[in-house]
Structure formats: structure tokens, C-alpha cells
Amino acid sequence: MSSDPDKMMSKADKMTKLTLTRWSADWRGATELYEQAANGFRASNKYEKAKVALEKASKGQEMQASPWDAAKHMESAAALAQKLSIWNEVADFYRKASELYVECGRAQPASDALGKAARALEDVKPDDAIQLYTDACEILEEDGRDQMAFDLYRACANVYIKLEKFTDAATFFLRLGVAADKCDATNSQCKAYLSAIILYLYAHDLQQAEKCYNDCSQIDAFLKSDQSRSASRLLTAYNEGDIEEIKKVASASTVSNLDHMIIKLARKLPTGDVTAIQMNTNDDLDEDDLT
């Protein structure tokens, strides 16, 4: 057999086409040739041709009812598309791989494939990356594997922060908190809730930060935590217009143990005019004082 990958591809293509003398496609033989051709192309750095060979090898494995091997080939094709900066194919190929893993009943690799796509697209297509991270989380949630999604929640929140969509980032930390609660991962849960509160404060939304704190305080584990005490001190300092106290809490060890992206934002607090916040609070009190 020729070791020329181009000739292998040509021969394999013929084996998949029906003719007057070939009444059924030889997908097994063709797939072996596509796989060998892909290796040959990769060895000679012909990544575009290797990618095409892997796509066809994946199709061949599908035709042989082998979705696991088909998924592996799609992931390899996606990695080559990334090397070639063909971003729409990166997303499409990893999504296809994920679907094939789901077909195998394998939630973890299905989620991992979407996570790989999201990481590849974070800088070039951040909105697509967010959707991929979201879908990756949902696959694990539906399979009852919430604890395996923690890093995905954080990664998605990080993309939102880069886009300065702080409220959306907070929402993902709250989702992380809910997932952590299901797994009895109390430390992760409390850190997630404090992170969400800091994000609301960074976005100048004291009212939402307070609502978030009050909602999270319904959970006993959070109410008794160091993270809850830090959140309470921050909110009190905001309401009192105490800039020094805000900076002190934001640089304390409890905040320093949060994710790096949250620490960076906390160090910049307060971002708004806290004296204006204090004046608004006092005005509200005056309006309520009818004596």
C-alpha cells in the first residue's frame, strides 16, 4: 500500500462511493486509510489536509456505529482548526464531538469538549465562549455532576468580567454557589457568594449587593462563615461611606483567598462615590420619617 497520504485519501474516498461494481461502501477500510492519511499529513505539517482527513475518519467511525472513536477524531480535527485559527470550525467540531460523547452516555468528556472550545474562543469570540461554557455546565448539571463544573462556572464568570458584564459574572458565581450547596462544598459555596457580592459592589449596585447578601444569609452555612462577615462589613462600610474600612476589608485574608479575578476587582473598591450612596440612603430614611 502506498504511504502517500494524498493517494490514501483518494483511495478511501472511492471506497465510500457506490458504483455499478460496488454496491456497499467499505467504511471500515476507508476509515483506516483516512486515519493513516491524517497521521501522514500531520507528520509533514500539512494541517489543513490532516484536518479534512480526521473529519472523514470521524464520519467513518460514525458509520461503523463507533461514536467514541468518532468523537476523538472530531476533537483532533478541532485542535488542528485551532492551530489554523479557523474559529468557526473549532466551535463546530468540538460541539460535534460533545454530541457524540453524549451519544455514548459520557457526560464528562462531552462537557470537556465544550470547555476546550470555550477556552480556545475566549479572546477571539468571547460571546461564543460564554455560550459554550454555559452548555458545558448544563451537561454536567443534568448528569448530577455539579461538582465537576466548578472551574467552568469560574471560567465563564471570568469572560464576563473581561467584557465588563459584572452582573452576569455575579450570576455565574451564584450558580456555582448553588452547585456547591448540592455537593456540600461549603467553602466553595461561601466564596462564590462573597464573590457575587463584590461584583455587584464593583458595578455600583449596592441595592443588589444587599439583596444578594440577604438571600445568601438564608443559608446557615454562609451566615456563620468568614465570607459572610466580610460581606457584612463591606456593606456596612458602603452605607456609612467609610472608604478606609472598605479598603481594609477588601485587602483582608478572606478576600485574598478568593479567585484572582475577584481579588483584582476587590482591590479597586470602592469604584463609585460612596458619599453619594450614603446621602441617598439618608434621603430614603428622611422620606420614611413622617414624625
From Swiss-Prot:
Q: Which domain of life is it from?
A: Eukaryota
Alphabetized UniProt keyword annotations? ER-Golgi transport, Membrane, Protein transport, Transport
Query: Transport: present as a keyword of the record?
Result: yes
- A GO term from the CC aspect: cytosol
Q: Which GO terms describe its biological process?
A: intracellular protein transport; vesicle-mediated transport
**Which gene is this protein's source?**
GSNAP
Database matches in InterPro entries:
NSF_attach, TPR-like_helical_dom_sf
Task: Specify the species.
Answer: Arabidopsis thaliana (Mouse-ear cress)
Bilayer topology term = Peripheral membrane protein
Asked whether the keyword Protein transport is assigned, the reply is: yes
Its name, as the record gives it, is Gamma-soluble NSF attachment protein
Subcellular localization, per the record?
Membrane
According to its UniProt entry, the function of this protein is described as:
Required for vesicular transport between the endoplasmic reticulum and the Golgi apparatus. Binds to SNARE complex and then recruits NSF to disassemble it.
Source organism lineage? Eukaryota, Viridiplantae, Streptophyta, Embryophyta, Tracheophyta
For this chain, the family text in UniProt reads:
Belongs to the SNAP family.
